[in-house]
C-alpha cells in the first residue's frame, strides 16, 4: 500500500501530476482543489495517497493532507460513488465546502457537481452525516481561498484546451466543458485558473 509520496514534480497535466520518487515516476490523480496548491514542476511536493486496484488498472489518488484523503475514502464507501465521482466532487468543492454542504443538507449545491443527481445528493447527505459523527475531532479546518498567479507558459488556446480536457476527465461532457471554459476564458489565464473559475462558476 502506498500512503505517502515525497518527490519532485516532473509534469502537471490536470488532474494528473507525475511525481518522481527515488527514480520512479508515479502518476497521481488529484482533485483540482488539491492540484491548485501544488508547487510548479521541478519543485518538491508531498502527497498523501490512496491506492485503488481495478480489473483494468491500478490508480493512485493524491491529496495535500490526511483529512482530504480521509474524506475521499469515506466518499467511495457511499453506494453509487466510485473514485472518479469522488474526485469530481472534491474538484468542484473543497473538503470544507463539501462538509458544510452535507451538514447543512444543501442538496441544491451538491446536484451542481458532475454526475450528482438529486437521489445521489440525498444519499450522500444521509450517509456522510452519520460518518462525520463517527469521526473524532475536527475533520477539517476552513482554509482561505487561494489566489492563483498566472505564470508564463502555454498560449491562451493551449490553456483553454487543457482546461476543457481536465473538465472532461472530471466527468463533464465535452460540449458542456467547452461552454464552461469559453464563458470565463481570458488571454492572461493559465489552465489551472480556468479550471478553478469554471468549476466555481458552475456552483
From Swiss-Prot:
Region Domain III, annotated ranges:
155-203
Q: Which GO terms describe its biological process?
A: DNA recombination; DNA repair
User: Which superkingdom heads the taxonomic lineage of this protein's source?
Assistant: Bacteria
- Where are the annotated segments for Domain I? 1-64
CC terms in the record's Gene Ontology section: cytoplasm; Holliday junction helicase complex; Holliday junction resolvase complex
| InterPro entries found in the cross-reference section | DNA_helicase_Holl-junc_RuvA_I, Hlx-hairpin-Hlx_DNA-bd_motif, NA-bd_OB-fold, RuvA, RuvA_2-like, RuvA_C, RuvA_C_sf
Compartments reported by the entry:
Cytoplasm
Which residues does the annotated region (Flexible linker) include?
A: 143-154
Transmembrane stretches in the record are none
Q: Which family does it belong to?
A: Belongs to the RuvA family.
- Domain writeup: Has three domains with a flexible linker between the domains II and III and assumes an 'L' shape. Domain III is highly mobile and contacts RuvB.
NCBIfam families, A to Z: ruvA
Please describe what this protein does.
The RuvA-RuvB-RuvC complex processes Holliday junction (HJ) DNA during genetic recombination and DNA repair, while the RuvA-RuvB complex plays an important role in the rescue of blocked DNA replication forks via replication fork reversal (RFR). RuvA specifically binds to HJ cruciform DNA, conferring on it an open structure. The RuvB hexamer acts as an ATP-dependent pump, pulling dsDNA into and through the RuvAB complex. HJ branch migration allows RuvC to scan DNA until it finds its consensus sequence, where it cleaves and resolves the cruciform DNA.
Q: What is this protein called?
A: Holliday junction branch migration complex subunit RuvA
Q: Which gene encodes it?
A: ruvA
Amino acid at each position: 500500500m502506498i500512503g505517502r509520496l515525497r518527490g519532485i514534480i516532473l509534469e502537471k497535466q490536470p488532474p494528473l501530476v507525475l511525481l518522481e520518487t527515488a527514480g520512479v515516476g508515479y502518476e497521481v490523480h488529484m482533485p483540482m482543489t488539491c492540484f491548485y496548491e501544488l508547487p510548479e514542476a521541478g519543485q518538491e511536493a508531498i502527497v498523501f495517497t490512496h491506492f485503488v486496484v481495478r480489473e483494468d488498472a491500478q490508480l493512485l489518488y493524491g491529496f495535500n493532507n490526511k483529512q482530504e484523503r480521509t474524506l475521499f475514502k469515506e466518499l467511495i464507501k457511499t453506494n453509487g460513488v466510485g473514485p472518479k465521482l469522488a474526485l469530481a466532487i472534491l474538484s468542484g468543492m473543497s473538503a470544507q465546502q463539501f462538509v458544510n454542504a452535507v451538514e447543512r443538507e444543501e442538496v441544491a449545491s451538491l446536484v451542481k457537481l458532475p454526475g450528482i443527481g438529486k437521489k445521489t445528493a440525498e444519499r450522500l447527505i444521509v450517509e456522510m452525516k452519520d460518518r462525520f459523527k463517527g469521526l473524532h475531532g475536527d475533520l477539517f479546518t476552513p482554509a482561505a481561498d487561494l489566489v492563483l498567479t498566472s505564470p508564463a507558459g502555454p498560449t491562451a488556446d493551449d490553456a483553454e484546451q487543457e482546461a476543457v480536457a481536465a473538465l472532461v476527465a472530471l466527468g463533464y461532457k465535452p460540449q458542456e466543458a467547452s461552454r464552461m471554459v469559453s464563458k470565463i476564458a481570458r488571454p492572461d489565464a493559465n489552465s489551472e485558473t480556468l479550471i478553478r473559475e469554471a468549476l466555481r462558476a458552475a456552483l
